[in-house]
């Protein structure tokens, strides 16, 4: 040992990649016994006399550091907020994503609120919630979930019908399934973490939990909470359980003293993709935590994702399907077009009109559309060229009836627009959004109540009364008892998007909308045929996804392989790629130039090489960050090298 005495190993709260490691600090005599693993401290940095926040990860006697250690400046709080399990999870997630552990901890540990913390320290741990009894999971064959207590990983198909709770509220069958699984986990004396995409799903799940689990046993932890409220919920998770923790993607980092269940609803929802570095998807976080904790894992959805299908195929997860007694009645209208050319050209074919009119006599009808707004895209009335802004070349659109076209990017009103191709000045509506669709339906069904639901106008629930509900994907309200008919419009437009995931994304959103229909109600898929329509109509989405995975495996597309995106200065990207060139077990696409002058390369590699590729690219990022260049015109001054950016498993890169 080079130095003896009490030593704390800390992780600085810093985004700098070169500081993504444990640093040794001496523990002053006055703080001995108080500085323990998991507390927040403040420590001095060697440069500039600055003080940084940090988490204590380890404590001990002595250090291998050759010189004198700096001492801890301040104990921020005696409350242990970073548990060993969450630290191990953050480190593992960061390493897998070629990122920094401090970035993960910003997602895992909320910002401190002093008053909340003082109240918790004064009051002590909260009393345990009343015990509950296990009751099993309805709608599935017996023993479908028996292996969860031993750490089974299950890919579960949801019961695709609305369910009425004892309280009178209606929720999706999936919410009842998760609530029953959570109740049985509590009955075994263990914690359950339930992750859902957004507040709409969370509201349903909390209603289902309220019918089965004591309120004291449920903790809500999500990004919509105010700072103090969220920190208070987080602190509750530090107390001994058992409890159920419900929230969005960050809830997967919630501390737990005895984790028994991790469950995700609808893991293909884009909201489960983390927008902050290191961009670890919620599904990957759940898989890592399940492996570390030995808890049971449930990936639940009306249709599974291609990523989950891969887990099933390699035997890592076991598929569980509900009893086939009830499934949505889906009718692809493309099969009816051969006899009517006018229907083939119509946005809403006559068969869909008839079903909507019939259903509207008795209850609500859902019309799902691709885009919000009135007319998100307009074009030249003469030559059909898409109209673009004269300032930034963004797409022009109309936001209300009689409104003037404006740019969707910069907001500039196109007062004197002229077509760049034919010089015409007249515009026509091309892409119809929810607003324009609602307007047209209102004219087609005079006297009918028309409701628009989208991101700007959220609607959560509806009574079982006649109404036309025009909703964008993911914003569909729940109707008491279920919709009397569902129309899925703009299918061709959804599939026209250039993306590797476009078909499975469409299948997921259609399946979720179909599950909102009451049993036996018609669900009409407009304008889509082939294997995709057949998969939805027969409710055998897994067969389509199985074939999709086989095609991607042949083409070496995700999730058959993993991807790393390397971008930045051309020289920095070249150096990073050189670090991988010691063997031929990966494939590099590019580099290609980007609009900002940087370049980007894509690296394809097998899962078995994931740890090695992530570590090598992380080392390249650290080398790039620690390098300094002296501008030739300014002696004595330094500037950082061009930034090198690495992202693994970007869902939108292909």
Regions found by a protein language model. Give the residues of each.
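Arginine-glycine-biased low-complexity disordered regions
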Residues: 562, 569-573, 587-615
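Inter-lobe coupling/hinge segments of SF2-like helicase ATPases
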Residues: 153-186, 190-221, 228-231, 238, ...
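Short secondary-structure junctions
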Residues: 16, 445-448, 580-587
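Accessory, non-ATPase domains that flank or precede helicase/AAA+ motor cores in DNA-metabolism machines
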Residues: 1-331, 338-341, 358-361, 477, ...
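Short, flexible turn/loop "capping" segments at secondary-structure junctions
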Residues: 16-18, 556-560, 595-597
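Short beta-strand elements
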Residues: 451-452, 584-594, 640-647
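Short amphipathic alpha-helix segments
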Residues: 540-542, 571-590
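Short, solvent-exposed loop/turn elements at beta->coil junctions and helix N-caps
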Residues: 12-13, 251, 456-459, 590-594
């Amino acid at each position: 040992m080079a130095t003896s005495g009490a030593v704390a190993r800390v992780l600085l709260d810093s985004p700098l990649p070169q500081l993504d490691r444990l640093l040794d600090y001496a523990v002053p005599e006055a703080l001995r016994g108080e500085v323990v693993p998991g507390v927040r401290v403040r420590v001095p940095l060697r440069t500039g006399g600055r003080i940084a926040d940090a988490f204590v990860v380890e404590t001990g006697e002595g250090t291998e550091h050759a010189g004198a250690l700096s001492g801890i400046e301040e104990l921020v709080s005696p409350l242990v907020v970073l548990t060993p399990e969450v630290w191990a999870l953050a480190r593992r997630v960061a390493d897998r994503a070629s990122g920094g552990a401090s970035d993960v901890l910003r997602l895992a540990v909320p910002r401190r609120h002093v008053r909340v913390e003082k109240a918790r320290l004064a009051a002590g741990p909260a009393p345990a919630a009343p015990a509950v009894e296990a009751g099993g999971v309805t709608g599935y064959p017996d023993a479908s979930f028996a292996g969860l207590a031993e750490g089974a990983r299950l890919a579960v198909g949801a019961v695709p019908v609305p369910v009425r709770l004892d309280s009178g509220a209606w929720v999706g069958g999936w919410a009842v399934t998760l609530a029953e699984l959570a109740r049985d986990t509590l009955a075994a004396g263990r914690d359950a973490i339930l992750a859902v995409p957004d507040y709409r799903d969370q509201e349903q799940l909390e209603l289902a939990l309220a019918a089965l689990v004591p309120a004291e046993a449920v903790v809500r932890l999500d990004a919509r909470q105010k700072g103090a409220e969220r920190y208070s919920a987080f602190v509750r998770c530090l107390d001994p359980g058992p409890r159920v923790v419900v929230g969005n993607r960050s809830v997967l980092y919630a501390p737990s003293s005895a984790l028994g269940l991790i469950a995700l609803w609808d893991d293909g929802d884009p909201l489960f993709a983390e927008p902050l570095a290191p961009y670890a998807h919620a599904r990957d976080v759940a898989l890592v935590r399940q492996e570390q904790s030995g808890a049971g894992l449930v990936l639940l959805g009306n249709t599974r994702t291609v990523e989950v299908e891969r887990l099933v195929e390699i035997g890592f997860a076991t598929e569980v399907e509900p009893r086939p007694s009830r499934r949505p009645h889906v009718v692809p209208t493309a099969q009816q077009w051969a006899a009517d050319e006018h229907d083939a050209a119509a946005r809403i074919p006559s068969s869909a009109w008839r079903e909507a009119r019939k259903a509207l006599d008795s209850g609500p009808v859902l019309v799902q559309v691709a885009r919000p707004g009135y007319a998100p895209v307009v074009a030249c009335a003469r030559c059909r060229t898409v109209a673009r802004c004269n300032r930034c070349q963004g797409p022009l659109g109309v936001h209300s009836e009689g409104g003037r076209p404006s740019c969707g990017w910069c907001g500039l009103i196109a007062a004197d627009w002229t077509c760049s191709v034919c010089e015409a000045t007249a515009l026509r509506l091309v892409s119809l959004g929810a607003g324009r669709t609602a307007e047209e339906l209102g004219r087609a069904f005079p006297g009918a109540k028309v409701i628009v639901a989208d991101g700007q106008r959220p609607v959560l629930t509806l009574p079982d009364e006649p109404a036309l509900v025009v909703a964008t994907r993911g914003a569909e309200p729940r109707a008491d008892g279920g919709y009397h008919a569902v129309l899925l419009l703009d299918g061709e437009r959804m599939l026209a998007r250039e993306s590797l995931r476009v078909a499975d994304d469409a299948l997921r959103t259609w399946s979720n909308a179909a599950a909102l229909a009451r049993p036996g109600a018609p669900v009409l898929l407009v304008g889509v045929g082939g294997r995709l329509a057949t998969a939805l109509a027969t409710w055998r989405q897994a067969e389509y996804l199985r074939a999709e995975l086989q095609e991607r495996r042949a083409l070496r597309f995700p999730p058959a392989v993993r991807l790393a995106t390397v971008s930045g200065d051309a020289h920095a990207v070249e150096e990073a790629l050189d670090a991988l060139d010691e063997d031929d077990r990966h494939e590099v696409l590019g580099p290609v130039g980007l609009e900002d002058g940087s370049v980007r390369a894509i690296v394809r590699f097998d899962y078995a090489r994931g740890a090695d590729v992530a570590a090598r690219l992380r080392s390249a990022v650290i080398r790039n960050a620690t390098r300094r260049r002296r501008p030739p015109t300014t002696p004595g001054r330094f500037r950082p090298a061009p930034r090198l950016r690495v992202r693994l498993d970007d869902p939108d890169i292909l």
